[in-house]
């Protein structure tokens, strides 16, 4: 039960941070291209790499902190960071083809699922 609360509070912090970055990008007039989201994805990927490597190299760090930072805060900030980590882990394990396949499939299927949802909802609502 405690792990659920750790993730819950972390995700709230991450979600608020994502919202703040997007609002800042809009205030700066960056509306033609999703710069806020691009920044969030890059920063989240960098941070999850730093956190995971720190926990891997430093024994004795409490795992509830890893859960709070990665699944919680960074999961709420961006799910792209988890995708980036999983792709790199496959690559580092020598599964280059699997890593590339996962990256291509994740992007293609995710965008495809969104397009399908748009089509279905528009069809249902418009009749």
UniProtKB/Swiss-Prot annotation:
Q: Is Transcription included in the keywords of this UniProt record? A: no
Can you name this protein? Fluoride-specific ion channel FluC
Organism encoding this protein: Granulibacter bethesdensis (strain ATCC BAA-1260 / CGDNIH1)
Keywords, comma-separated and alphabetical: Cell inner membrane, Cell membrane, Ion channel, Ion transport, Membrane, Metal-binding, Sodium, Transmembrane, Transmembrane helix, Transport
Which catalysed reactions does the entry list for this protein? Answer: fluoride(in) = fluoride(out)
Task: Tell me the superkingdom of the source.
Answer: Bacteria
Q: How is its activity regulated?
A: Na(+) is not transported, but it plays an essential structural role and its presence is essential for fluoride channel function.
One example of a Gene Ontology biological process annotation: cellular detoxification of fluoride
* Cell location: Cell inner membrane
Function summary: Fluoride-specific ion channel. Important for reducing fluoride concentration in the cell, thus reducing its toxicity.
Q: Which GO molecular function annotation, any one, does this entry have?
A: fluoride channel activity
Q: How does it sit in the membrane?
A: Multi-pass membrane protein
Q: Where does Na(+) bind?
A: 75, 78
Residue ranges crossing the lipid bilayer per the database entry: 1-21, 32-52, 71-91, 96-116
Per the record, the similarity remark reads: Belongs to the fluoride channel Fluc/FEX (TC 1.A.43) family.
Q: What is its main location?
A: membrane
GO cellular component terms given for this protein: plasma membrane
Q: Name one Pfam family in it.
A: CRCB
Keyword Metal-binding found: yes
